[in-house]
């Protein structure tokens, strides 16, 4: 028979009392009243914050957007097939945040910062809130450094500066994304961190962009944030803010950054869908009243920081898709009024063979002129005016039978300028090459050359300068100014190439 010893029992009880965990966990919990269309109505969650992350029983995350008297409207960040009426919801006490830092470079992530490229977890210790206030007036400096796109038409006539917001606007299939990708590729030697945000695009399109950047060595300094067409509306809505947060981290470290939002039309549509399902009152074109604020608070985060803040910059290139060239619709007019200028792409010009299809007449850069390099500013001053006059004359000359010599000469020069500004995709030019091409056109050095030979002239001149006159390219690239000696070298080079082409003809 086993003897019971009271001292042993008391020792065991004492040990168990000592090991007892007294910690109490308090959770803010609610119950699902209704779920459907990516929206859940939740009862409870009394102390939830606006924009707070909540977690459902099946692990789906949500964002508390509507805080009402008797329920909370939550948008789901996933399919949420496992959520049922009566399921519990737990508030996390956290606002949506994203990992940031060097570890993000070269990666493809979703709007919550989770990897989508199959390269494993992102080893980043830094985290930043997705929504952040924009820098204040005192923290900013006026735009004064150029952001070279490598596209002659833009760098010469619609220059973009670091810290600027320049809208790229046009119908579908007019080359909007191509301009953005060219700009990223052109930053290879500029030490600029790039963020490409794909909103509501086909997965195949995002894969194609990723491959193009990888082939050209641009993925090493680029982060891709993708919220595809099949993703929840909440993720498409959040994607641009995630891109801004990733770029902000580098901006506040004193680096230059470039963010492409491709495109904000789809983000506005996702926000409209969420707002209507949350029963918010619709306004013009059924968009909610705060859709302007949705875009303005995003684009105001782009800035050129003051010296005291570390001299960093964030340049934003938002893209907007128009319907049949209508720039007077609600979202296009909103974004035009927020940004510092726009590059307007025309489907008529695109179909006529002018690529990039930039309509120079209504494209403008409101602050970039201050950032333009002296070398190209000096020679491109008349370019925009000459092209505008050419467009006017070309329309007039269709009805006029006999034109005087001066008008014919002006039309001839306009045609040559148009040809000079044609540029193949994924082939950005050096500043020195742009200077040489624009100089040849505006100074009338190509007036004798047949129009069909202009494209060949551009190719020959670039090769000639690289092989025979590297001192010209080095001088322009380093000094950013056209000296008298450089001008003499360039004039001689242009004459050599033109005479060679005329002899061949």
From Swiss-Prot:
Molecular function per GO: ADP binding; ATP binding; proton-transporting ATP synthase activity, rotational mechanism
SUPFAM superfamilies, per the entry: C-terminal domain of alpha and beta subunits of F1 ATP synthase, N-terminal domain of alpha and beta subunits of F1 ATP synthase, P-loop containing nucleoside triphosphate hydrolases
Catalytic activities: ATP + H2O + 4 H(+)(in) = ADP + phosphate + 5 H(+)(out)
Residues that, per the record, bind ATP: 170-177
Membrane-topology annotation of the record: Peripheral membrane protein
Keyword tags: ATP synthesis, ATP-binding, CF(1), Hydrogen ion transport, Ion transport, Membrane, Nucleotide-binding, Thylakoid, Translocase, Transport
Site entry: Required for activity: 363
Entry's localization field: Cellular thylakoid membrane
Tree of life domain: Bacteria
Cellular component aspect of the GO annotation: plasma membrane-derived thylakoid membrane; proton-transporting ATP synthase complex
Broad EC category: translocase
HAMAP family linked: ATP_synth_alpha_bact
Its job: Produces ATP from ADP in the presence of a proton gradient across the membrane. The alpha chain is a regulatory subunit.
Family of the protein in this entry: Belongs to the ATPase alpha/beta chains family.
Assembly information from the UniProt record: F-type ATPases have 2 components, CF(1) - the catalytic core - and CF(0) - the membrane proton channel. CF(1) has five subunits: alpha(3), beta(3), gamma(1), delta(1), epsilon(1). CF(0) has four main subunits: a(1), b(1), b'(1) and c(9-12).
Name of the protein: ATP synthase subunit alpha
């Amino acid at each position: 028979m086993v003897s019971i010893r009271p001292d042993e029992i008391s020792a065991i009880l004492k040990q168990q009392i000592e090991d007892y965990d007294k910690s109490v966990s308090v959770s803010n919990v609610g119950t699902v009243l209704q779920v459907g269309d990516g929206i859940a109505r939740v009862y409870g969650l009394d102390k939830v914050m606006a924009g707070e992350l909540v977690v459902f029983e099946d692990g789906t995350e949500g964002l508390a957007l509507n805080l009402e008297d008797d329920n909370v409207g939550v948008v789901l960040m996933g399919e949420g097939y496992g959520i049922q009426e009566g399921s519990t919801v737990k508030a996390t006490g956290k606002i949506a945040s994203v990992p940031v830092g060097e570890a993000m470079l070269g990666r493809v992530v979703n709007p919550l910062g989770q990897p989508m490229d199959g390269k494993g977890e992102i080893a980043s210790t830094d985290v930043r809130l997705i929504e952040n206030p924009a820098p204040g007036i005192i923290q900013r400096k006026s735009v004064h450094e150029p952001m070279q796109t490598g596209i002659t038409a833009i760098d010469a006539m619609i220059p973009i500066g670091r810290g600027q917001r320049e809208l790229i606007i046009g119908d579908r299939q007019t080359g909007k994304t191509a301009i953005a990708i060219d700009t990223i590729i052109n930053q290879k030697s500029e030490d600029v961190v790039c963020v490409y945000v794909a909103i509501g695009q086909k997965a195949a399109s995002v894969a194609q962009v990723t491959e193009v950047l990888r082939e050209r060595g641009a993925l090493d300094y680029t982060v891709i944030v993708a919220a595809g067409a099949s993703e929840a509306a909440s993720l498409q809505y959040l994607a641009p803010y995630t891109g801004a947060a990733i770029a902000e981290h580098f901006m506040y470290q004193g680096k230059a950054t470039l963010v492409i939002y491709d495109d904000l039309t789809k983000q506005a549509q996702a926000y409209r869908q969420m707002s209507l399902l949350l029963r918010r009152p619709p306004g013009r074109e059924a968009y909610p009243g705060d859709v302007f604020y949705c875009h303005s608070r995003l684009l105001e985060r782009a800035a050129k920081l003051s010296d005291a803040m570390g001299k960093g910059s964030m340049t934003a290139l938002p893209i907007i898709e128009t319907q049949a060239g209508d720039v007077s619709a609600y979202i296009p007019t909103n974004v035009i009024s927020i940004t510092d200028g726009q590059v307007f792409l025309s489907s008529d010009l695109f179909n006529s063979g002018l690529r990039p299809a930039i309509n120079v007449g209504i494209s403008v850069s409101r602050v970039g002129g201050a950032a333009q390099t002296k070398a190209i500013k000096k020679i491109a001053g008349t370019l925009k005016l000459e092209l505008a006059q050419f467009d006017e004359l070309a329309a007039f000359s269709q009805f006029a039978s006999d034109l005087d010599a001066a008008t014919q000469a002006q039309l001839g020069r306009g045609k040559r300028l148009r040809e000079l500004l044609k540029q193949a995709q994924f082939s950005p030019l050096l500043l020195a090459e742009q200077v040489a091409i624009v100089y040849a056109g505006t100074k009338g050095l190509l007036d004798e050359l047949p129009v069909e030979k202009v494209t060949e002239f551009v190719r020959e001149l670039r090769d000639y300068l690289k092989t025979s006159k590297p001192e010209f390219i080095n001088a322009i690239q380093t000094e950013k100014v056209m000296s008298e000696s450089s001008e003499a070298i360039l004039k001689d080079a242009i004459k050599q190439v033109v005479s060679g082409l005329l002899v061949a003809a």
